[in-house]
Amino acid sequence: MEHTYQYAWVIPLLPLPVIMSMGFGLILIPTATKNLRRIWAFPSVLLLSIAMVFSVQLSIQQINGSSIYQYLWSWTVNNDFSLEFGYLIDPLTSIMLILITTVGILVLIYSDGYMSHDEGYLRFFVYISFFNTSMLGLVTSSNLIQIYFFWELVGMCSYLLIGFWFTRPIAASACQKAFVTNRVGDFGLLLGILGFFWITGSLEFRDLFKIANNWIPNNGVNSLLTTLCAFLLFLGAVAKSAQFPLHVWLPDAMEGPTPISALIQAATMVAAGIFLLARLLPLFISLPLIMSFISLVGTITLFLGATLALAQRDIKRSLAYSTMSQLGYMMLALGIGSYQAALFHLITHAYSKALLFLGSGSVIHSMEPLVGYSPDKSQNMVLMGGLRKYIPITRTTFLWGTLSLCGIPPLACFWSKDEILSNSWLYSPFFGIIASFTAGLTAFYMFRIYLLTFDGYLRVHFQNYSSTKESSLYSISLWGKRIPKGVNRDFVLSTTKSGVSFFSQNIPKIQGNTRNRIGSFTTSFGAKNTFAYPHETGNTMLFPLLILLLFTLFIGFIGISFDNGGIGNGIAELTILSKWLTPSINFTQESSNSFVNSYEFITNAISSVTLAIFGLFIAYIFYGSAYSFFQNLDLINSFYKGNPKKEFLDQVKKNIYSWSYNRGYIDIFYTRVFTLGIRGLTELTEFFDKGVIYGITNGVGLPSFCIGEEIKYVGGGRISSYLFFFLCYVSLFLFFFLS
């Protein structure tokens, strides 16, 4: 066991040889390296697979072992301060290592097919391999300074990958937005680290936890200063994990290639913020104000993310807001002290969301031959529909991933989300109500994504869409195309006078909501006959989907309670995950309830599943094939006609759509207040610099310049003139001096 721990430091370094080899190849033999570029995918996958084997072995040994601090190198700054670099292996590290390596391997395999025809294939593999290295280094860090170093590397890699297609202005803008937003959090993290170093004189986790256990309860340190420093540390996690109000970068990050969208939102960048809070939770748990603030931010984020996902048309942006909401659940769990539930949901969500993102990439690939390579068309769900006939494997995997995220048993996310909901109700009914209501919203918007993408008919070939030829109910006018005369312009899912609408499209247009259109459709929307249809992707893209499907089906069982001996009327709560986390400090809420009553578990499960099924049902009514059935029964129309508050309900739906489609107006608020405000300040500074500073400088120098210009014409270049003026000046001097 100790022999294995000795070489744990190798895990973050394993992907580096491939990165350096590709770099040297591009410098020394660029032509051969580019011609044989797809060969480099194999060593990238191989080395990360070796890292995964190491991680699994460490995790197995960690179950019955203890945390290991190992120092590799010390840099002595002076006699009083030194920086020690090493690694920390504990259950949290083990979980993250397995998560990063498994998802990373599958994303690399998927990327080989997804990026095969891209000119930046090698550059992409260099970036993504370095991304994995940075994240592996972050989770094995033994102190705050190491975490900050790898934290910045993760941010740098995300900047490069989000702006991978940097020739597209929208992608360049997106990576800048992600960089600037995360700099706010990174600055807070750095200040928090420096603050705790000033308090303790150390950057080691053990010293910080000593403060939490001994000094803070006994008023050994300034509680206000400690709370401020803890808040600054939390600010770093807020930006990295896309929590309100620093969440605005995450939807725009979808401008990068789909594989990196999957990696960012499943196992790397957004997981870094959750990891940081989980690592420092022994410190935060001793500061009740910070814990309450964490839970509040998580609650706001989970609800906000769900509402913003309701009306998105871009499939990747919809999934991005879903990620934001699920990260809010994890943040809420950490804020209420439910450490195990947060990590459990981190695991289950990672595999489910990776499955959904890679599935969306398969959908996008299948749509590009029809609509072109412009993301605002190939990712637009309004142009999809009926894909279940053309890409059945992708459809099946996407459906299972959707149901998992909706919380349908026995899929992965059901177990973790149900645990968070139960703990939130125990902690506060306020948090429980919002979390439970959002669970229903999650089922609604996730099933909406599935139905718009796979249900009905392929809408790209029609100017108006309806699931039945005769029906005008919910005919969808194409985004960006001329709307026919028979279609109501006031609704997204527009109808004739006899139809019913769901969301209003008559909204203020905000700059930045629409993206620059590049490329063109390869088929005519008005064509009656077309032979272009979507097709299933290659095996290198389907294989990761099938493996992730297995994880989605079975990974949730590690959190299922099993009997460890009766205690009273309950069953001892012992799970594989809790056994795995036994060596960690037992500071979570679960410790207060050593057993769970089976009746209580079933009751909570029934409640959460009922909410999920209700959300699925509502989504199916509005977006599924069932709406033609309800129209034939005149069920919906009779409800609307007999409802005296129809106009009020229409206005409510219009406002909901406007709020969701325009991202809650948060982006436009930031643009007007911060972006335009800072630009106005820079213009004012420029005016002051040129008008005042330059004015004073030029005002002093200008008279001297003018006098010199006048004097230089006096001499004329004649020596006799110089002697004449010299004698005159001497005579005047002597005259005044002698008189």
Curated annotation (Swiss-Prot):
Single annotated GO MF: quinone binding
Pfam families: Proton_antipo_C, Proton_antipo_M, Proton_antipo_N
Keyword presence, Lipid biosynthesis: no
InterPro entries assigned to the protein according to its UniProt record, in alphabetical order: NADH_UbQ_OxRdtase_chlpt_su5_C, NADHpl_OxRdtase_5_subgr, ND/Mrp_TM, NU5C-like, Proton_antipo_N
Keywords tagged on the record: Chloroplast, Membrane, NAD, NADP, Plastid, Plastoquinone, Quinone, Thylakoid, Translocase, Transmembrane, Transmembrane helix, Transport
CC per GO annotation: chloroplast thylakoid membrane
Principal subcellular localization: plastid
One Gene Ontology biological process: electron transport coupled proton transport
Transmembrane segments: 9-29, 39-59, 89-109, 125-145, 147-167, 185-205, 219-239, 258-278, 280-300, 327-347, 354-374, 396-416, 425-445, 542-562, 610-630, 719-739
Membrane topology according to the record: Multi-pass membrane protein
Self-association state and partner proteins as the record states: NDH is composed of at least 16 different subunits, 5 of which are encoded in the nucleus.
Family: Belongs to the complex I subunit 5 family.
Record-linked PANTHER family: NADH-UBIQUINONE OXIDOREDUCTASE CHAIN 5
Stated name of the protein: NAD(P)H-quinone oxidoreductase subunit 5, chloroplastic
Gene expressing this chain: ndhF
